[in-house]
Amino acid sequence: MKIVNVESTFNIHNLHFFLYETFILIPRQTPIQFGLQFFKFGGKRDYDEACEDWDPSIGVDQTNGNSNFNNEFSNNGIDSSNGNFNQFNTNTNNNNNNNNNNINSNLNNGLNINSNNNNNNNNNNNLINNSNNNNNNNNNSLSTSLSNNSVPLTISSNNQNSLVPSNNNNNSTNNNNNNNNNNNNSTTNNTSTTTTTGSTSTSITTTTTSGTSKKGERKRTKFPEEEVKVLCDLVILFGKDVRTILTFKPFSGGKYSERQIYDKVRALKRTGLVPTNPTSDDIKKSRFDLGIADNVDIQSLKSTKKGRLSNYVSNSSQSSDSDYSSSDHEDDDYIPNSTLSSSSTLPIPSNPNSNKRLIISRNPNQLSSTNVNNNINNSGGSSNNNNNSNSINNNNNNNINNINNNNNNINNNNSNNNNNNNNNINNNNNSNNSNSIHNNNNNSNNNNNNNNNNNNNNNNNNNNNNNIINSNSNNNNNNSNGNITPTTPVTSSRRSIQILQENANHLISQIQNQMSTTPPITPTSHHNAIPIQSLSNEIINTPSRTRERDRIEKEKEKLEKERLEKLEQKEKERLEKLEKKNQQKLLEQQKEQQQKEQQQQQKQQKNNRHHLDLTDDEDEDDDENSLKSDNSNNEKDVNLSNNSSNKGSGKLNLTGNSVFDYYSTGHNLSLYKSIKTSPSSMVTIPSPSSSCSSTSSIIGSSSSSGGGGGSSGVIGISSKYNYSFNPFTTTSITSLLPTTVNSNSNSSGNGSSNNSTPIVNVISTSNSNSNSNSFFKYETDNNLFIYYPFFNQNTNSNNYTFERDLLTLTVEVPSIFDWIKDKQPQNIDKKIKIEFPHPGKNYGPPRKVNKLPEGINGVGFIFEKIKQGSVDFDISIL
């Protein structure tokens, strides 16, 4: 147990302080436990009663009502302006006992700023000060703030003092009891029994950070599209060589950091914008786009700088490299905060309830082995103190510095500046641009106004960086009264503090060495790089490059031509295959159709030998116009309608006084046609059972017209050949042109007539085909015309005889049968014989028509009607 140094001015209050110090240092009793007992047994009440008898004029400046302890009291002080107990500061075992009266003026809102020769180690293991105090606190947290707010601890190298306040209403300062054996992580070693009831404190903030970011959280850098294209070409040529990429425009101007370029390269590779294994064509294209000639070696353009990335990049990613390597952050573009552009962050052990970050400057002019930070923003844990105040730690001097301003404006060295706008703590006597927080020899205890009167002007802080961590003396005081001799720092039992010191020193030395030996990244010279901006139009348009472009264009045209040819060839092959396929389908359909037709024909031949339904044949155009006449004056259309009927005679009723009957022989494949027209004069020839050939059948009959009696003749047609095939598949006679028969051209004798009647409106749309032995019968008032349309009339083999009322005609099969033979090979005898019976005594002998209308093939005969007398059957007249 330590004995408190008691002065001659000892009174009841000093006794109370002595007892307080004595009891608070009882072993195995924490400040929290003692504080509970203190309030439980009326310690607060007894203290208030004891204070009633104390003369407030002792050691009090009556001019402003503030306690002035400049040379009055050395250890203890009480704020008499409001009667509130502010702080017990009984630092013992100090070398400076009541001689210097040095007091550090510290901010009380959200800040625990520990200064000169006071080994104040907070519960977050933050290295704050080196002192000669014998602290037996296992946690090395002799004093911390009692803030309920978690304020991040930042040690910054910027030239502005960032003070992040807590929202505390009470601003009591806490003493450091050096001989405290505190086994729990208590943030204060004394329990303040007073609470200030002043107005809510105003926040004093001068921030250097825009906030803390979460682990792995990065801001993305937006690269313009043009820069992305250039970056893709550079990655194809140089891969992930960030330092080489930064030698090219637009990346060489310091616009982007190495980490930003590296992250963007990884994102491009991951998203596939840059091929993993670029081909020679890709490399050639990238060269062309970047303006790098083919004769330039890529290796010569690479940066010669070795080692890891810049400290800024490596430090900024140290805490999140493992997280950033995941796929969630590979395409993140990280933009550092503009206010932290010259700083890097280093994670340090921190309280789980707070977020602290150590910020180290990169500027070598602001670095020293003993000066690291300007500001400390500290949020502490809990204590038995009932107020939400932030403790202010004093030096090892036995003086009390009680800053209890409601507005929290701190002015140093006799300056009554109220810095409410920028909230900077200004030290007018500092020789540097930064703001010192250490104010020695200040005994002002101002609780009523906003101005802290610093009565001692002997302190000129010459710290370049306003260091809070001091291994040597940080204050060079002009007066001997204010000098504090630094001592060797107490080695902490916590290994984390040592590691933190080593890391900080190592980081400082590393930054200094790199800044002194390695220049910042700048655009490389023309010896190892060809920046894009240096390539002029003259270089681009040199003959070699022009030839190269022409060659590349020719190659592109050639490749395009080959591609088009291949496409055309493929299309041609496809069309050929399609055509062959269609032809094959047509052939198969034709074969199937022929087979169906043959089966149908055979079936019809078996079932009905005399009635076969056949389809029209479009190829028989020669048979459509069977009869034409040269006499254009008597041309009339003949309509012939064909309808199948029973076996017998077909009747053609013409519009005039003539009837045209169609006859067919009785062969096996003969087809019978019945032509019906409007009812007019019709002629019917009875078919007797005699005077017919055994092989012929009576097709039709014609009655005599006029007044010639009732006798009738038999018209019979016989053939020596009976064919077992159908000579035609399809035949249609669409029109039978008018035919004029001149009776005088081929006949002579009595009773001949020049009267002729043309065939009018004969249209045949037969569903079946005519047999080669079929014929047409055309009868007028004066003549009977028989026409065989399927034979050639001018061949020598055609001859006819008329014997015993029977006209026998021997003709040659026309060329149409050659076409039939090609379709159905048969042994066809082209010469056939046709027998036609004489119509009767009312008709004269047959006369052959030697000339038929042009374009009509066949054989025609005329039988002239005899109205009076008998018929001369002399064949010689023919």
Swiss-Prot record:
Residues 64-213, 314-325, 335-355, 373-494, 596-605, 639-652, 679-704 have a biased composition (Low complexity). Residues 362-372 have a biased composition (Polar residues). Residues 615-624 have a biased composition (Acidic residues). Residues 585-595 have a biased composition (Basic and acidic residues). It comes from the Eukaryota. Residues 58-223, 306-494, 585-652, 679-709 are annotated as: Disordered. This is Uncharacterized protein DDB_G0288805.
